[in-house]
Design a protein with these regions (language model features):
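A short, exposed loop/beta-hairpin motif centered on an aromatic-Gly-Thr core
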Residues: 11-24, 28
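Hydrophobic beta-strand residues in large extracellular and virion-surface proteins
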Residues: 4-8, 25, 29, 100
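Short aromatic-glycine-(Arg/Gly/Cys) micro-motifs in beta-strand/loop hairpins
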Residues: 1-15
Length: 107
């Protein structure tokens, strides 16, 4: 039986969650990344997406979706794209990393 695992390492501590669906794992990953980045509203999302490395980028660029209700209505394929865009904003901080893996339940 396939399952998906969301794994995260933050400040040397590891945690993981298991999910029956790929979409569930991606949603958990996006939620964790958004929490790590401190995104709670539209203003936070724009600031983080356009000014994460201390260099203000194009302020007219809209950030990827972050509203949990809207994310839940998307497909796994759409969510992977959003996850990729947000997780890229964590790459400058070597204290945080996360990954989604598919595995099987062994008997």
């Amino acid at each position: 039986m396939p399952i998906w695992v969301f794994m995260v390492r933050y400040d040397g501590e590891m945690a993981c969650s298991t999910h029956f669906t790929e979409k569930g794992a991606i949603l958990a990953a996006i939620e964790d990344v958004l929490q790590y980045l401190g995104i709670e509203d539209d203003e936070d999302a724009k600031k983080v997406y356009n000014d994460r490395s201390g260099i203000e980028e194009d302020a007219a660029v809209e950030p990827p979706e972050w509203h949990h209700e809207k994310l839940r209505k998307m497909t796994a394929g759409e969510l992977y794209g959003i996850f990729g865009e947000w997780v890229e904003k964590t790459w400058d901080d070597f204290m945080y990393e996360c990954e989604i893996l598919k595995t099987k339940v062994a008997a």
